[in-house]
UniProtKB/Swiss-Prot annotation:
InterPro entries named among the record's database cross-references: Asp/Orn_carbamoyltranf_P-bd, Asp/Orn_carbamoylTrfase, Asp/Orn_carbamoylTrfase_sf, Asp_carbamoyltransf_Asp/Orn-bd, Orn/put_carbamltrans, OTCase_ArgI
Pfam family, one: OTCace_N
A GO MF label: amino acid binding
Known function: Reversibly catalyzes the transfer of the carbamoyl group from carbamoyl phosphate (CP) to the N(epsilon) atom of ornithine (ORN) to produce L-citrulline.
The keyword Disulfide bond appears for this protein: no
Catalytic activity: carbamoyl phosphate + L-ornithine = L-citrulline + phosphate + H(+)
Keywords for this protein: Amino-acid biosynthesis, Arginine biosynthesis, Cytoplasm, Transferase
Binding residues for carbamoyl phosphate: S55, T56, R57, T58, Q82, R106, H133, P134, T135, Q136, C272, L273, R317
PROSITE patterns, A to Z: CARBAMOYLTRANSFERASE
The protein's name in its UniProt record: Ornithine carbamoyltransferase
Binding-site positions, L-ornithine: N166, D230, S234, M235
Compartments, record wording: Cytoplasm
Length: 331
């Protein structure tokens, strides 16, 4: 499967076979790194990393993956990039495309990364937008494949919580594209948009995926192998929305009881991180003092239990991002 010079903007752009090719390559690269026999296939390549939103995992994954493969990466932090402020997206794309072999973008509007791809003349990779998080999806799929013990098209997973944004959208599309049994458990007001749901159903017709959207969290998790969640308040939202979001989502918190409701003693917990699972951060302590919650979207008991595979998931960000870059740029 030839993925040379391909943009990586959203999973909707790819066939199930192409997504599986990325996963297979990521698994190969992971094995090679751990065995100390990694072959550098991106020597002499230069990659620009544009971050309009800050990040730990995405930045580190791109930088380490590039370095492992012999490439150099330039990090453009939020305060350093002029994109859309003093210089148009179109002009930024054309400038960076002359200097770099690929561009990663992490920011707000999906339209921005699509416009970069239109004008850059080099592969563009989506590190996260408000609408989609495709590199996270490869990491999640690889992690589920490693822990499932059966093919992904025989695997069921649920996402519970606020499903309107990049994680809910992307997991729904991922499951549909890979023929999985995917469930969304959320208040209807926090479901993905009608357009995303329609796209998922269209993909499911091709792959045999099963799609369920329900307001009942226990129904969503029944029989699944994996339960995913994400933070209830996104980057940049005001503190005032916390009370409203907690009131809406308190029944979707991942607790030992919700894990048990899966009926699967081997069920695993997944989270793209960072997670509010205790009081050990300033935000976590503020939430406890303000709302009396020790842990928000997931309890400490679940997060730190053997069911939690979030750090396998985080590690796989690097291996799957490396696969995206090697597929596009590798010799």
């Amino acid at each position: 499967m030839n993925l040379k010079n391909r943009h990586f903007l959203k999973l909707l752009d790819f066939t199930p076979e192409e997504i599986t090719t990325y996963l297979d390559l990521a698994a190969e690269l992971k094995d090679a790194k751990k065995a100390g026999r990694e072959i550098q296939r991106m020597k002499g390549k230069n990659i620009a990393l544009i971050f309009e939103k800050t990040s730990t995992r995405t930045r580190c994954a791109f930088e380490v993956a590039a370095r492992d493969q012999g490439a150099d990466a330039t990090y453009l932090e939020p305060s350093a990039s002029q994109i859309g402020h003093k210089e148009s997206i179109k002009d930024t794309a054309r400038v960076l495309g002359r200097m770099y072999d690929a561009i990663e973008y992490r920011g707000f509007a999906q339209e921005t990364v699509e416009e970069l791809a239109k004008y850059a003349g080099v592969p563009v990779f989506n590190g996260l937008t408000n609408e989609f998080h495709p590199t996270q999806m490869l990491a999640d799929a690889l992690t589920m494949r490693e822990h499932s013990g059966k093919p992904l098209n025989q695997t069921a997973f649920a996402y519970v919580g606020d499903a309107r944004y990049n994680m809910g959208n992307s997991l729904l599309i991922l499951g549909a594209k890979l023929g999985m049994d995917v469930r969304i458990g959320a208040p209807q007001s926090l479901w993905p948009s009608e357009g995303i749901i329609a796209a998922a159903h269209a993909a499911a017709k091709e792959t045999g995926a099963k799609i369920t959207l329900t307001e009942n969290a226990h129904e969503a998790v029944k029989g699944v192998g994996f339960i995913h969640t994400d933070v209830w308040v996104s980057m940049g939202e005001p503190k005032e929305v916390w009370q409203e979001r907690i009131d809406l989502l308190k029944d979707y918190r991942v607790t030992p009881e919700l894990m048990a409701a899966s009926g699967n003693p081997q069920v695993k917990f997944m989270h793209c991180l960072p997670a509010f699972h205790n009081r050990e951060t300033k935000v976590g302590e503020w939430i406890y003092e303000t709302f009396g919650l020790n842990g928000v979207e997931v309890t400490e008991e679940v997060f730190e239990s053997p069911a939690g595979i979030v750090f396998d998931q985080a590690e796989n960000r690097m291996h799957t991002i490396k696969a995206v870059m090697v597929a596009a740029l590798g010799d």
